[in-house]
């Protein structure tokens, strides 16, 4: 493991000392820095750019919401809860955030109008919270300033030139000659990681099965899809497409439409727009600008194009090569390659921030304990490497299966349900840990216990059944991809897997292929809890029963959990 290098020369008159140096002040770096500083560490937070600034990762998920709760409660950083919902972001940060009431998916074929029967939607239960479309320049700037208020030394427009590690720590030297001496380094800088470059950590090619590249920017004037779809009212979903994250699915790719103007109190006219597609099927042209290329694909899909009539781009395009990258490892002597600095799959399903904050949770207490014990043995941090690897592995499996299925609606309808079936128990196990923490005098052991699971990185890592369901789905989709199965055969296999699995919740409609719009009501949630506590398999009954009893106890004690 390339983790130690000769000691760097020190100049005690110039080198500034800290406990932790954080490279990158996006949400990953700023939240980590705020947590560490709030809990007594001396932290430097530096970035080559400055706030406010554009960032991708704008769509929230139920699991992300729960991780935000956990980080705020466990590490006593209440400002993190300002990201919990569109109401909270609007109140605490500003009126620039959209609402996310659903994940919406519509299948498109070239030069054809989309069939309204080839659409799926998952509505997020109102019982939880009204998630936000995060306007990242505001959310990231907010958390950066939270970190500063907790005492972090900050540097903007500050580019690291050298990282020199030895047994006792790391010396970080900027291009301006300024030097810092730290006991531990977190690299949260993303793909262009100086740490990954220094230790040659990138795997070539990336180890993942999935392939995609992306074009993205911000627009004003994007029309709601509801206004241009031309679909009859009786075939439309229960929640307007414009009220959530819209995914326009094409063969081996998808357009995203993430509006920031869809919340009643928003004053933000912008809409995030992107196209992510398999670079092997859609090679990057050398003779087109990103805008010309994007418009070429818009011309192929008339209903999507109608959303752009009269709209105007307000940012330069970002045009990537292959998005997927991976690292040999993400933990070494006195350093961590965090989340998007370690690897990336695809923005589909908006897993990025949820995965990031799961890593922040696992890393932060280990650093605080290491500072207290003055013991930074790599072994103390090995779980973080295992976690980052597992999160990427299972996400790769799901996203690759999904891209394969986009060419055949029946198969997509099946894969959509596998994804959906993973969400609720994944959130429930986190809620259970938070309930235990609150009811047991804020004992952090209940969060540490989450790590004792056989399938690290899976949404419900204790579940052999969900792991088997996901693996069988991936195997089936791969057989369809190479022609061993046709689309109907592959879809039928996945639907049988769903039907036969006792761990898949039947009350939402995941087992019914005719129910394309999943919109849990309060009554649906009551029926679900009855199934989870009385009719589900033992592991689900245990999870459901403890959540229900914990919520009742917490409510009786006046603790607000949701």
Regions found by a protein language model. Give the residues of each.
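Feature captures the FAD/FMN-dependent oxidoreductase FAD-binding
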Residues: 91-190, 194-195
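N-terminal FAD cofactor-binding segment of flavoenzymes
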Residues: 53-112
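Predominantly flavin-linked oxidoreductase catalytic cores and closely associated redox partners
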Residues: 146-303, 360
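Beta1/beta-strand and adjacent pyrophosphate-binding region of the FAD-binding site
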Residues: 11-28
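FAD-binding beta-loop-beta segment adjacent to the flavin cofactor pocket
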Residues: 317-338, 343-347
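An active-site-proximal "capping" alpha-helix that borders the catalytic cofactor pocket
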Residues: 68, 351-371
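Active-site-proximal substrate-binding core of FAD-dependent oxidoreductases
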Residues: 362-415
């Amino acid at each position: 493991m390339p983790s130690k290098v000769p000691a760097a020369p020190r100049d005690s008159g110039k080198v500034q000392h800290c406990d932790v140096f954080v490279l990158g002040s996006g949400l990953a770096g700023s939240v980590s820095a705020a947590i560490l500083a709030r809990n007594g560490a001396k932290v430097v937070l530096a970035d080559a750019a400055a706030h406010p600034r554009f960032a991708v990762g704008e769509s929230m998920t139920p699991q992300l919401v729960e991780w935000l709760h956990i980080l705020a409660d466990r590490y006593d950083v209440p400002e993190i809860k300002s990201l919990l919902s569109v109401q909270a972001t609007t109140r605490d940060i500003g009126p620039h955030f959209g609402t996310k009431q659903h994940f919406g998916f519509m299948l498109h074929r070239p030069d054809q109008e989309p069939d309204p029967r080839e659409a799926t939607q998952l509505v997020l239960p109102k019982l939880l919270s009204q998630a936000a479309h995060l306007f990242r320049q505001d959310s990231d700037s907010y958390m950066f300033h939270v970190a500063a208020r907790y005492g972090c030394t900050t540097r903007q427009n500050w580019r690291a030139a050298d990282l020199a590690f030895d047994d006792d720590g790391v010396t970080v030297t900027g291009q301006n000659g300024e030097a810092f001496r730290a006991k531990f380094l977190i690299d949260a800088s993303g793909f262009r990681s100086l740490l990954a470059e220094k230790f040659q950590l990138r795997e070539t090619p990336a180890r993942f099965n999935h392939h995609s590249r992306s074009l993205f920017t911000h627009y004003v004037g994007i029309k709601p899809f509801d206004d241009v779809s031309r679909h009859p009212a009786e075939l439309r979903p229960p929640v307007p497409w414009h009220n959530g994250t819209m995914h326009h699915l094409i063969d081996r790719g998808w357009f995203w439409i993430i509006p920031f103007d869809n919340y009643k109190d928003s004053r933000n006219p912008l809409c995030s727009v992107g196209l992510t597609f398999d670079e092997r099927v859609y090679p990057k042209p050398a003779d087109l600008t990103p805008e010309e290329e994007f418009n070429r694909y818009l011309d192929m899909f008339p209903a999507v194009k109608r959303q752009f009539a009269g709209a105007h781009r307000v940012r330069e395009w970002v045009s990537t090569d292959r998005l997927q990258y991976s690292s040999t490892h993400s933990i070494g002597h006195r350093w961590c390659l965090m989340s998007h600095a370690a690897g990336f799959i695809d923005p589909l399903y908006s897993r990025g921030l949820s995965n990031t904050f799961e890593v922040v949770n696992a890393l932060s207490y280990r650093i605080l304990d290491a500072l207290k014990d003055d013991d930074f043995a790599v072994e103390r941090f090995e779980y973080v490497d295992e976690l980052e690897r597992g999160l990427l592995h299972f996400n790769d499996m799901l996203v690759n299966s999904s891209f394969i299925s986009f060419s055949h609606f029946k198969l997509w309808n099946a894969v959509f349900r596998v994804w959906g079936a993973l969400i609720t128990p994944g959130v429930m196990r986190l809620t259970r840990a938070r309930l235990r923490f609150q009811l047991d005098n804020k004992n952090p052991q209940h969060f540490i216990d989450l790590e004792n699971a056989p399938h690290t990185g899976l949404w419900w890592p204790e579940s052999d059944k969900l792991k088997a369901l996901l693996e069988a789905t991936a195997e089936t989709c791969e057989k369809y991809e190479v022609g061993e199965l046709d689309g109907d055969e592959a879809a039928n296999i996945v639907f049988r897997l769903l039907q036969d699995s006792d761990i898949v919740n039947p009350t939402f409609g995941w087992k019914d292929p005719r129910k394309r719009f999943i919109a849990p009501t309060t009554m649906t949630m009551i029926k679900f809890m009855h199934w989870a506590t009385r009719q589900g398999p033992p592991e689900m009954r245990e999870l459901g029963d403890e959540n229900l009893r914990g919520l009742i106890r917490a409510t009786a004690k006046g603790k607000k959990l949701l």
